[in-house]
């Protein structure tokens, strides 16, 4: 798996996959999870090159998922894609180990800009 996309909205997971392809990353293997609990299970199957996660999800928030990921992997790039993106949330995310944060709605160019330094 190259990218793990974690969002409780199936529509948003599809939008993210499409944005990744439109940004020129058609050959990447994108795996999906509905929440942090399911995402942790997916991580047992292998380490992605990048994790994209929503912030607000049932069962386990994106922030809690990030903290659990960072307990075992401090290097995998982790980006939040969320509709709530206050300065306080950005500080909390970055201080917890996030690599970047994107606001919804986003454009394919926003995705490309975030992915270029990570996947090249």
Where does each model-flagged region fall?
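Two-component/phosphorelay signaling modules centered on CheY-like receiver
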Residues: 10-31
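Helix N-cap/capping motif at the beta->alpha junctions
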Residues: 32-41, 62
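Short amphipathic alpha-helix used as the core "switch/output" element in two-component signaling
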Residues: 41, 63-74
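Active-site beta3 strand of CheY-like receiver
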Residues: 46-52
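Active-site residues of response regulator receiver
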Residues: 54, 82
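Receiver (REC) domain active-site loop signature in two-component systems and cognate sites
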Residues: 57
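Alpha4 helix (beta4-alpha4-beta5 surface) of REC/receiver domains from two-component response regulators
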Residues: 64, 85-100
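C-terminal output helix
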Residues: 106-115
């Amino acid at each position: 798996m190259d990218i793990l996309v974690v969002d409780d909205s199936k529509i948003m997971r599809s939008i993210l996959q499409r944005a990744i392809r439109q940004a020129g990353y058609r050959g990447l293997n994108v795996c999906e999870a509905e929440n942090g609990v399911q995402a942790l299970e997916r991580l047992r199957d292998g380490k992605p090159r990048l994790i994209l996660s929503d912030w607000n999800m049932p069962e386990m928030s994106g922030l809690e998922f990030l903290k659990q990921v960072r307990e075992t992997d401090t290097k995998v790039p982790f980006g939040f894609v969320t509709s709530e993106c206050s300065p306080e949330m950005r500080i909390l995310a970055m201080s917890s180990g996030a690599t970047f944060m994107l606001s919804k709605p986003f454009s394919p160019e926003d995705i490309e800009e975030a992915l270029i330094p990570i996947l090249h």
